[in-house]
Amino acid sequence: MRIKCYLLGGGTNGYLVWDEQSREAMFIDPGAYAQAIADDIRKENLTLSLIVLTHGHGDHIGGVPQLRAAFRDAKLAAGADEAPLLADVDRNLSRDICGEAVAPVPDLLLKDGDTLTLGALCFRVLDTPGHTPGGISLYTEAIDDGLFEDDEYTGTLFPGDTLFHGSIGRTDFPGGDFEALKNSVRAKYYTLPDDTVVLPGHMGGTTIGLEKTQNPFVRP
């Protein structure tokens, strides 16, 4: 597995993830700069099959229309419970964040336990509400061999804005729920192996083990 992180508008992290053998790829949370993302996908000779949204806020969806136009065969996937927020340009904050209304309609509505595949790679969908009502995360037992050359890590989690290095996502936006977020972290993240790499929607990476011992907002 290979992963390329993009620093997008508003300090959002977007991730291009692909299987090295098949060259099949997905992009997680294209918040902006869709043209630059598309150029990189073509430069790497990748086939973009999936665009995945961890949640529906404008800083994570702003580039969706342009990226879908550039790769018409790519399927847009989001949590099934996130569809109402995606459709509501006031609640998804796209006007405030993107300067225009963005309301993408997913092709695939994902639920807890669903799986997504890229070549030989398999990603498990985790329902992780709290930051938004229908937020999801992706977990895979694969790691990026180029970034992590030893055997220290055994999996990768993409939590969107639910969990950060030493922090958690905001719950004061429409549909946010602090108790639901804490439950998502404890039930879905803290049950993963401690050596799972966490690549969040903002700020730098961390591990599950580090957050379990040092995150002041959610203790196991």
Where are the regions a protein language model picked out?
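Short secondary-structure boundary segments
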Residues: 30, 55, 80, 161-162, ...
